[in-house]
Amino acid sequence: MTQSIRVAVSTVILTLRRTESGDAVLALPLVLRTREPFADQWALPGGWLTTAESPVDASARTLSETTGLAPSYLEQLYAFGAVDRSPTRVVSIVYWALLRQDDVDAQSEAHRASGRAPENVRWFDIDDLPSLAFDHAKIIEYALWRLRNKVGYSRVAHGFLPSEFTLADLREAYEAILGKSLDPANFRRQVEASGNLLPTDRFRTGSHRPARLYRYNTDVALADRGPLGPEETSIR
Amino acid sequence: MTQSIRVAVSTVILTLRRTESGDAVLALPLVLRTREPFADQWALPGGWLTTAESPVDASARTLSETTGLAPSYLEQLYAFGAVDRSPTRVVSIVYWALLRQDDVDAQSEAHRASGRAPENVRWFDIDDLPSLAFDHAKIIEYALWRLRNKVGYSRVAHGFLPSEFTLADLREAYEAILGKSLDPANFRRQVEASGNLLPTDRFRTGSHRPARLYRYNTDVALADRGPLGPEETSIR
């Protein structure tokens, strides 16, 4: 049987970056398309699924080729397949990951040094996105919705933070994800009651009064992929 | 560009059915394959995605053709795309839904009466599945894992119940999903504290002492599809 339907992958990589005004905002990398359809418009990193690789491997490959980024875990976001989402019939399997800003900086720098980094990649704050190709605006909106839902019942914000962090760091990540301010005292009570955080003996010192550093309780696995093996869920 | 990758859909339909011994067990419909690959083995209802329909519409169509079932909402479970999951290269987008046993009975009966019901469909209890084609055993295992996870933070068990039910009915559904017995008093405390249930003025009477009927608090939508439209998420 011949099908005139092709399979593509796209990847939503979110990081928390500090603006010049000192705020933390969510940002993601986009690629300026050089050919039709949607030439000269921005799109998520991605490409065609090839015969010899799984969708998650294709996501990792195309992400690495364009941005140099190599997240330790890519989660499947959704398979988008509406009939009219592209001028030709394309089903896109979309993956997503959260990356710490320092990992983004290190991996991007190594990619530039390799001489293989394309010129047409740029990071955008999610509240200042350009016009997007295909249904990629909707895909990003869905990824942000999923992130906001997930932050309520999991340790997803950990993906933005170093191994040790202050409660103010964690609250700042939650505020950027949820797009609203949180009361510091309420936030402290809630995260302490959750049992997810363990206090360390260390403090961050600086211009403010010393703030205790916390780490996540790693008795619970961060990325529980359930019964699926690595061929369906992550990068080998 | 030509891709030798084809796109299929499959559907996992779960219901809670009562065995002859009076227990409630999870069950799902399977289709006996009549051709290669995996001829004479059981598989999930499904088929090829056609050019003019979205994956969720293809799931609804193939499910209806084989089983006569028409769930009001199909949720995307996962896109399975491992290279070796089929003798040829196939990406399967899998949807799932929960159906009440009385809806299953009514829709199956109407399908049989139509004269279009195929002979090769049968329901199986999930603890007594036959040998399955492709990676369908893993897909079912993943659907059950997702259901068990979801029951903890959502009203997913509602999909198995009529609009009014006793706490014993609800506990029985949870026990079938989780595969373990739950303490009746603890269970009552937890669901009452959740705020998800509203007591009615009605009682079920019969051979036992009268049991109060409850309904779900429908202030919260049961199936929150987020920012995705119906072309990606459900049946029109």
In which residue ranges do the predicted regions lie?
Chain A
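Short, charged/polar surface micro-motifs in flexible loops or helix N-caps
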Residues: R18-T19, E36-F38, T50, L98-V104, ...
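NUDIX/MutT-family hydrolases
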Residues: V94-A97, A106-L147, V151, F160-A168, ...
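Active-site segment of metal-dependent pyrophosphate-handling enzymes
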Residues: I5-V9, L26-A27, P55-A60, S64-R112, ...
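Long, intrinsically disordered, low-complexity Ser/Thr/Pro-rich regulatory/activation regions
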Residues: P199-R236
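Short histidine-centered catalytic/ligand-binding loop motif
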Residues: L44-A52, G159
